[in-house]
């Protein structure tokens, strides 16, 4: 039966579902310690149930004074490193490193399952979070006592929407205006959601009016928004799917992260360029999460020899999707055997090498997982050495296909093709053309044709999966990588495995709708002809008129 949102608050629906169906504890606001910005009782309960020896070695809970020292250190770690890093890597206190979370276990490890079951997922309504203000946040979610997310909820029945929730975060949840509100401070909480019964928006760093909220919607009919839900609330997938324990664990383990990138900026006082480290707190958008999860599921179930076309428009965050996919593909197992021995990312963007390295290093301490191959020799060495992730440039693609189809035919590979910048970077097409014919390309925009020609000329090797990311695939690309779908008339149509359309990107504000600002040739010609033929014609007025055409 569809839920009657007019009879139940959205808050009640969400909290009740997490408590009754997802196995969350329901907390109360007084559980939250405003001094430390976390739930001390649940942190203590989690640690005592899993790490008694470490507690004894450090005497961290033997007195109120020792407890205060422990929680002060933990709170400082949240501020410095961020909650996701503390959950993944734990934190050091005196001589011990305390685990703050136990990750999702494999099916082959019953002991790990027992530890995972010790994790405490908790949802709290109306959290009073500040020492100075009496404001409360609608919904607060914690894991082992550490803050994961906050939510401000609205519903159309009361005449408010997600935009009102965003406004509330920007105007009433400014961390600079209230330093005692630790849950609002940078890094200490992974994500903040603005939710109504139709739409979801998210923000990873609250900065007053500068807070940037991104859509976390599924998309509907190729555009923005969410499809109708059988339960009546279009946003029910948030608590029914995304916030399930295994799903939330997956996001925290494999997607959420803090990245650092060096950028040259101009010093306003000296005028000189200086290097500045840009910090970004990342939480996946829904289409990224859905895409990577579907690709992993299909790979796990179908093994090697598959082809996938991912049609993601500009503004989709392809670079992050590619890094998340590459990192997780190398971890897929069939029993105890890796499904893929190596994942190869074919790109023209050198910066993607750095991005993948940085992203993976933020997940686990894994040395030499990623290698960059910019020559035939380094590529050959990386392949022969069995590197887990190899990033290489496009004109080495012919060698890759030949190598994995002959001397490495007993190994299994995943090939991720990054075509994101094919229409923006002429050098990519030129390199592909040189690889094929030794000549400079006449058409700078035919990267897809080059890749297709290479693959056709050598045939698709059976010991590899292909994951082709592109914004606007040509018919040949659809035929080569798309999923075959038989039609009623007997013909076979090839469709993308996953889509984030240009229409959705435009409606969500990630790219401009150029059609709103174009001028027809007829209008342009008419104005130019009039101006040239009449020296007294008002050019300013003509330009204004042209803009309105």
Language model features with spans:
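Structural recognition of the conserved hydrophobic beta-strand(s) that form the central parallel beta-sheet
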Residues: 193-194, 390-393, 464-470
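Catalytic P-loop NTPase motifs of RecA-like helicase/translocase cores
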Residues: 157, 423-424, 476
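Conserved RecA-like ASCE ATPase "motif II neighborhood" in helicase/translocase motors
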Residues: 387-419, 423-434, 441-456
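Conserved helicase motor
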Residues: 347-350, 370-380, 394-399
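Conserved motor-coupling elements within RecA-like helicase/translocase cores
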Residues: 362, 376-390, 406-407
């Amino acid at each position: 039966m569809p839920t009657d949102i007019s009879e139940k608050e959205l808050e009640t629906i969400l909290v009740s579902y997490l408590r009754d169906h997802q196995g969350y504890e329901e907390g109360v606001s007084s559980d939250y310690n405003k001094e430390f910005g976390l739930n001390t009782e649940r942190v203590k309960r989690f640690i005592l149930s899993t790490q008694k020896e470490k507690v004894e070695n450090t005497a961290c809970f033997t007195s109120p004074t020792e407890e205060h020292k422990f929680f002060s250190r933990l709170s400082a770690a949240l501020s410095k490193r961020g909650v996701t890093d503390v959950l993944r890597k734990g934190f050091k206190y005196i001589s011990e490193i305390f685990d703050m979370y136990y990750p999702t276990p494999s099916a082959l490890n019953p002991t790990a399952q027992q530890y995972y079951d010790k994790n405490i997922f908790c949802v709290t309504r109306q959290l009073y979070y500040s020492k100075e203000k009496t404001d409360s946040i609608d919904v607060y979610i914690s894991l082992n006592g550490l803050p994961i997310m906050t939510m401000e909820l609205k519903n159309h029945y009361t005449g408010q929407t997600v935009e009102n929730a965003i406004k509330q975060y920007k105007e009433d949840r400014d961390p600079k205006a209230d330093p005692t509100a630790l849950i609002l401070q940078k890094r200490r909480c992974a994500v903040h959601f603005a939710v109504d019964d139709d739409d979801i928006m998210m923000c990873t760093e609250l900065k007053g009016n500068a807070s940037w909220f991104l859509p976390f919607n599924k998309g509907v009919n190729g555009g923005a928004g969410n499809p109708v839900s059988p339960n009546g609330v279009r946003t029910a997938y948030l608590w029914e799917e995304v916030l399930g324990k295994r799903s939330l664990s997956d996001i925290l383990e494999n997607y959420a992260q803090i990245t650092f990138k060096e950028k040259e900026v101009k010093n306003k006082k000296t005028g000189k360029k200086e290097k500045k480290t840009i910090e970004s707190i990342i939480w996946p958008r829904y289409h990224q999460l859905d895409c990577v999860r579907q690709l992993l599921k299909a790979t796990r179930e179908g093994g090697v020899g598959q082809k996938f076309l991912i049609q993601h428009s500009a503004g989709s965050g392809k670079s992050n999707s590619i890094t998340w996919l590459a990192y997780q593909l190398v971890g897929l197992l069939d029993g105890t055997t890796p499904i893929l021995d190596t994942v190869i990312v074919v790109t023209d963007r050198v910066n993607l090498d750095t991005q993948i390295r940085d992203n993976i290093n933020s997940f686990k301490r894994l040395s030499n997982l990623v290698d960059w191959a910019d020559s035939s020799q380094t590529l050959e060495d990386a392949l022969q050495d069995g590197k887990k992730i190899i990033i290489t440039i496009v004109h080495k693609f012919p060698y890759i296909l030949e190598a994995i189809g002959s001397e490495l035919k007993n190994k299994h590979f995943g090939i991720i093709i990054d075509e994101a910048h094919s229409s923006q970077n002429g050098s990519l097409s030129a390199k592909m053309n040189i690889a094929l014919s030794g000549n400079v390309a006449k058409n700078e925009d035919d990267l897809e044709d080059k890749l297709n020609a290479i693959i056709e000329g050598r045939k698709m090797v059976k010991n590899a999966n292909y994951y082709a990311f592109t914004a606007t695939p040509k018919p040949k690309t659809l035929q080569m990588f798309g999923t075959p779908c038989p039609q009623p008339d007997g013909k076979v149509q090839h469709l993308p495995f996953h889509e984030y359309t240009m229409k959705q990107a435009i409606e969500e504000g990630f790219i401009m709708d150029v059609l709103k600002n174009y001028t027809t040739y007829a209008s342009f010609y008419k104005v130019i002809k009039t101006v040239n033929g009449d020296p007294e014609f008002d050019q300013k007025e003509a330009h204004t008129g042209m803009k309105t055409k």
